[in-house]
C-alpha cells in the first residue's frame, strides 16, 4: 500500500488535476494499492474564508458564492446539491449572527476538502476506475481545540483500520486531508500543514510501505517561487538541512 498526498494547487482545474489523475492511475495499474489524500483544490479555502468575511460584515456574498460553485463544478458531472444547501445554511447563520466562531470556521473550510475528495473520486469513476470519497472525520478523532486540534491517535487508529477493512477490494480511497471531528462529532481542523499530517497519520495507521507528497513545484527552493522571482531550486540537500528549512 502507498499513500499519495496531493496539495491544493496541484489539484486545481486544468492540467494540474489531469496530472494528478495520471499519477493515481499509474500507481493503481502498477499494483501499489494507492490511498489518496487530498487538500482543498486551488484557492478554495481562501474563497470560503472570504465568503465568511462577507457574511460577517453583512455584505452580499451571493455572487462570490456562485463563482465558488462554478469553479468547483468545472469539468465534472457533480453538482454538489447537498453541499450547496449546507453551505448556504452555514453562511446564512454567520450573516445573521454577524460572527464566525472558530468552531463555525472549521465547519466552513472543511467543505474545501470534502468537495475535493468527491471531485477526484468522480473523475476516476469517469475514467472507469472504482473510487470512493472518504471524510477523514469518520476516523480522525480530536480534542475540541478548533482551528488547530490535536489527534487522539489510538482511537483514530482503531477507527481507521475498521473503516478501511470494510472497503471493497480494488477500490481507490480518496481521503480528505486537514479535517477531523471531536468526540462529540463536531468538525475540527488540524491547523497549518494539517493535510500532510493527515497523510502521515494514515500511512502509520495502515502501515503503508511509502508516503509520497506531491506539490505544484518540482523540488525544494531557496524561497517560495510564487513570491520570490529569484528563488532557486536546491539540487541536493541533507535531511537535517531540509528539517531546518521546514521550521
PLM regions: where:
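Nucleotide/pyrophosphate-binding catalytic subdomain
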Residues: 1-247
Amino acid at each position: 500500500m502507498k499513500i499519495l498526498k496531493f496539495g491544493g494547487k496541484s489539484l486545481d482545474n486544468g492540467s494540474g488535476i489531469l496530472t494528478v489523475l495520471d499519477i493515481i492511475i499509474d500507481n493503481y495499474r502498477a499494483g501499489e494499492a494507492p490511498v489518496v489524500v487530498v487538500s482543498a483544490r486551488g484557492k478554495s479555502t481562501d474563497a470560503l474564508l472570504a465568503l465568511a468575511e462577507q457574511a460577517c460584515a453583512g455584505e452580499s456574498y451571493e455572487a462570490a458564492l456562485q463563482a465558488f460553485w462554478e469553479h468547483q463544478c468545472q469539468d465534472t458531472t457533480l453538482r454538489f446539491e447537498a453541499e450547496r444547501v449546507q453551505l448556504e445554511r452555514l453562511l446564512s447563520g454567520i450573516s445573521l449572527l454577524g460572527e464566525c466562531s472558530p468552531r463555525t470556521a472549521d465547519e466552513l473550510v472543511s467543505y474545501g476538502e470534502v468537495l475535493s475528495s468527491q471531485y477526484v473520486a468522480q473523475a476516476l469513476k469517469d475514467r472507469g476506475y472504482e473510487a470512493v470519497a472518504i471524510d477523514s472525520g469518520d476516523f480522525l478523532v480530536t480534542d475540541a481545540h478548533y482551528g488547530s486540534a490535536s489527534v487522539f491517535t489510538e482511537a483514530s487508529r482503531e477507527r481507521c483500520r475498521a473503516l478501511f477493512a470494510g472497503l471493497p477490494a480494488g477500490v481507490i480511497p480518496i481521503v480528505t486531508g486537514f479535517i477531523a471531528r471531536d468526540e462529540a462529532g463536531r468538525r475540527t481542523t488540524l491547523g497549518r500543514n494539517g493535510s500532510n499530517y493527515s497523510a502521515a497519520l494514515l500511512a502509520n495507521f495502515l502501515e503503508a510501505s511509502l508516503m509520497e507528497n506531491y506539490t505544484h513545484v518540482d523540488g525544494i527552493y531557496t524561497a517560495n517561487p510564487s513570491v520570490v522571482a529569484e528563488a532557486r531550486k536546491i539540487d541536493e540537500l541533507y535531511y537535517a538541512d531540509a528539517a531546518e528549512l521546514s521550521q
